[in-house]
Amino acid sequence: MSWRGRSTYYWPRPRRYVQPPEMIGPMRPEQFSDEVEPATPEEGEPATQRQDPAAAQEGEDEGASAGQGPKPEADSQEQGHPQTGCECEDGPDGQEMDPPNPEEVKTPEEGEKQSQC
């Protein structure tokens, strides 16, 4: 007697209906207007201090880009397609060239061998 194992076919399970959550109410922008208002500067603080963080942030951005150094520029075709030594190149328009006419192709002699793609 051989053991047949568990069947891989499963009957589709009945779909359970899930009721959508109840809506609390419409979302209104007026509810959030108090939280969105920017803080007003105090009398003791000059208004120029509020602009300093923006200037400091610009300075940090310049330093970060200078620390990365120049990016090496390489030909994208060389990175995307490694050459194996037997590569057929595309035509000048980037489209493949039509195969040559068989009547015009010369057959190589037995002594000569050509690599074919």
From Swiss-Prot:
SMART domains: GAGE. Residues 103-117 have a biased composition (Basic and acidic residues). Residues 1-117 are annotated as: Disordered. Expressed in a variety of tumor tissues but not in normal tissues, except testis. Signal peptide: none annotated. InterPro entries: GAGE, GAGE_fam. Residues 32-45, 87-96 have a biased composition (Acidic residues). Antigen, recognized on melanoma by autologous cytolytic T-lymphocytes. This gene belongs to a family of genes organized in clustered repeats. They have a high degree of predicted sequence identity, but differ by scattered single nucleotide substitution. Their sequences contain either the antigenic peptide YYWPRPRRY or YRPRPRRY which is recognized by cytotoxic T-cells. Belongs to the GAGE family. This is G antigen 4. The gene is GAGE4.
